[in-house]
Amino acid sequence: MTIQIYNTLTRQKEIFKPLEEGKVKMYVCGPTVYNYIHIGNARPAIVFDTVRRYLEYRGFDVDYVLNFTDVDDKIIKTAKDVGEEVPVLADRFVNAYLEDVGALGVKKATKNPRVMDTMDDIIAFISALIEKGYAYEADGDVYFKPRSFDTYGKLSHQSIDELRSGARIQVGEKKEDPLDFALWKQAKDDEIAWKSPWGEGRPGWHIECSAMVKKHLGDTIDIHAGGQDLTFPHHENEIAQSEAMNGETFANYWMHNGYINIDNEKMSKSLGNFVLARDLIQAHDPRVLRFFMLSVHYRNPINFTEALLESAKTSLERIQTAYHNLSHRRDSSLNLTNDDAKWLQLVSAAMSKFEQDMDDDFNTANAISVLFDLSKEANVYLQENQTSTEVIDAFQDAISQILTVLGINILEDEETLLDETIEALIKERNEARKNRNFARADEIRDMLKEKGIVLEDTPQGVRWKRGK
């Protein structure tokens, strides 16, 4: 099988061919750290972490770089408003980001470069662009000339003339052409600044990523990823800067995730429907939030509602319950029989389907459907009088492998079941008793007892508590 990636640059799926066999250079645009991240920021963190996980599952060594923009107009303003130094504020929100995405199951990046630590590289990059004729200095500012780069607009599929018609020079700007964008900004009074050949100042946003990519991954990388909103101008400008500088293709594959809507409206501060990731993490199991994010293909918009999140919770519980049921039956299972061959074949086919779905532009929505099918078939298998450890292990290994790629860990619940899972098992036990399937009802009671959960049947229904 071969992996296909939808490339924003060509607007089609392409077979993934890394620059170096067995290795992947991947760069993801991280946050500007002036506040806690909202769920729109959390989506690319989850999506591209999952892409990384699948590439690693397929045997690739992934050099995964995610940057932090730690100096910016918004950061400077926020620092002034709260009376903090810019580096102190940036550190605080870098740590908050890592805490939030860590709770969402995001693996640590290979590197997390920051702008303040890359200043010498940024200045050297800008100097080279000036020497090559792609940029110019204007009274302490430095601007890049998109018209000097022949293929400008190729990522966003816009012509230079179309872009020119909507561009304006703002009051106070020193650029020669409305399309020109800042590589270096002259320092303002009382703002953090760095020394440069053009006087004290700080870099523009776009040049920061180009310099960090070059420093940590080289002139050409395999995958560059980020939110759909970054396609233009940020990623377009990155391409122009980097390819003008290096004379090489900047990135072979460009990946962009879709927007998040809140109750069918685009999330924005002006609408007041701005949802912080950490608020959801505190209110819900973060694994449910991740599961919800992956239930829709990454390129599609996703609509967030509490009802849909609750539905994701129920769906994940179904998978957890199937896994725990398998665990309970394993110890009482026997050796493999001839009748079990069909079940092993079913599990093998499911894993092939999972890989087929993920090979097709990382289709996590379809991969989750495979999980549901496996869970359903596992429950059917457990209804048989005799089960084998080999089949149970096959089911559990398959479910575990898929969940690991999706970044969802349910194994931590093996010793202490989540309350939601306990309730789901009690509900299943009630249904079994109602259908006079007393063997299954007793089996569930015994399983919960082994996990330290004591059931008490009362006239008002079943109550449960954790045993000492």
From Swiss-Prot:
Organism field: Oceanobacillus iheyensis (strain DSM 14371 / CIP 107618 / JCM 11309 / KCTC 3954 / HTE831)
Ranges spanned by the short sequence motif 'HIGH' region, renumbered to the chain: 31-41
Cofactor binding note of this UniProt entry: Binds 1 zinc ion per subunit.
Pfam families: CysS_C, DALR_2, tRNA-synt_1e
GO terms of molecular function: ATP binding; cysteine-tRNA ligase activity; zinc ion binding
Designated name of the protein: Cysteine--tRNA ligase
Catalysed reaction, written as an equation: tRNA(Cys) + L-cysteine + ATP = L-cysteinyl-tRNA(Cys) + AMP + diphosphate
InterPro entries: Cys-tRNA-ligase, Cys-tRNA-synt_Ia_DALR, Cys-tRNA/MSH_ligase, CysS_C, Rossmann-like_a/b/a_fold, tRNA-synt_1_cat_dom, tRNAsynth_Ia_anticodon-bd
Modified residues annotated as Phosphoserine in this record: 270
